[in-house]
Design a protein with these regions (language model features):
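Beta1-alpha1 glycine-rich phosphate/pyrophosphate-binding loop at the start
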Residues: 2-97, 193-238, 285
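FAD-binding core/adjacent interface of flavoenzyme oxidoreductases
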Residues: 2-16, 88-187, 285
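Short glycine-enriched, charge-decorated loop/helix-capping segments at active-site entrances
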Residues: 62-68, 146-150, 242, 300-302
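Helical element adjacent to the flavin cofactor pocket in flavoenzyme catalytic cores
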Residues: 80-83, 243-257
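A conserved beta-strand/loop element that lines the FAD pocket in flavoprotein oxidoreductases
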Residues: 87-94, 254-266
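Active-site acidic short loop of glycosyltransferases
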Residues: 126-127, 268, 280-282
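Flavin (primarily FAD) binding-site architecture
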Residues: 136-145, 290-302
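Conserved small/polar residues in nucleotide/adenosyl-binding loops
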Residues: 307-309
Length: 309
């Protein structure tokens, strides 16, 4: 790691103003791009984007990746290429700490899929720091969510769900025994925009998948989708008329909509409801809430709102 004792953030330093944007989501990426096109191109600022991923996919598309309806390679934006085209620098890494006195963002080491280190710990000096790292899944302390449910926050998670869905269908198609109740049941916990859109997309995608030769699976009988929401209605942040229209549409597709239903636990067996019922489910998606990343709580002097709990 660079020597943190050096006054790298000193206002007396020479050279262009250093702007570091942490987080390459929609907001952070657009900001880095615009700053690069205006200030970076003319040498008036040194713009750096930091992200733990190597490419960007617009988050509202993740439900389509999960359903297998969208080819990620056709929609991802490579950070290195974007940086080259728009006059900023990309750093592969994740924010783990902040030295505000010396104006240094601390980046943790990164590793590949086999556990080999790709980049060491580093210190990224800045004059202006923008934190745009977005949110992470909030399981509200519900037992079993981390072990038995798949969130949809990243491309990797969406791809993981899609692989498990494909494997579940192939298993059902080739097994000798009859398809068991709940075997091809997908339970989606959380009926905000992500959960609701996923339910509709899965209905279409699974029936298309079965049409490609999986003749042992009856989509109307064997493929079950359940959308679970603790609030009195789905899409609770939207006007009630839209919620009612979406409910009617989903139920018309055969999706079981369970509003006003609380989840007490998720196990290998399925979803346990607060009223004692158990929904046997082969796949469980958790889209019930978000919170600020844990690193925000470790940044000295940063004021937090209630969403970071």
């Amino acid at each position: 790691m660079p020597d943190a004792s050096q006054p790298q953030g000193s206002p007396l330093r020479e050279g262009p103003h250093r702007i570091v944007v942490v987080g390459g989501g929609a907001g952070g990426l657009e900001l880095a791009t615009r700053l690069g096109d205006t200030l970076g191109r003319r040498g008036q600022a040194q713009v750096t984007l930091v992200d733990r991923a190597r490419s960007h996919l617009w988050k509202p598309l993740l439900h389509e990746v999960a359903a297998g309806s969208l080819d990620v390679d056709d929609h991802e934006l490579d950070y290195l290429a974007q940086a080259h085209w728009h006059h900023f620098t990309y750093r592969y890494g994740e924010l783990v700490g902040l030295d505000r006195a010396r104006k240094i963002a601390l980046l943790g080491p990164t590793f590949d899929e086999e556990g080999r280190q790709v980049t060491p710990e580093r210190a990224e000096p800045y004059d202006t720091l923008v934190i745009a790292i977005g949110s992470t899944t909030n399981d509200f302390g519900t037992p079993g969510v981390r072990d038995h449910a798949i969130p949809l926050e990243t491309t990797g998670q969406a791809r993981r769900f899609n692989r498990r869905l494909l494997n579940a269908c192939i298993r059902a198609q080739t097994q000798a025994e009859p398809i068991a109740p709940g075997q091809l049941h997908v339970a989606i916990i959380g009926a905000g925009a992500t959960g609701t859109e996923l339910a509709a997309e899965l209905h279409r995608a699974t029936r298309q998948l079965v049409a490609y030769g999986m003749d042992r699976i009856d989509p109307e009988r064997d493929l079950r989708l359940t959308l679970i929401e603790a609030a009195p209605r789905i899409l609770p942040a939207l006007p009630e008329r839209l919620s009612e229209a979406a409910t009617k549409l989903l139920e018309g597709l055969g999706v079981s909509v369970m509003a006003g239903t609380r989840v007490s636990a998720v196990t290998a067996e399925g979803v346990h409801l607060a009223d004692g019922r158990v929904l046997s489910s082969e796949l469980v998606v958790w889209s019930a809430g978000v919170k600020g990343p844990a690193v925000l709580g470790a940044l000295d002097g940063l004021e937090l709102s209630l969403i970071h709990i």
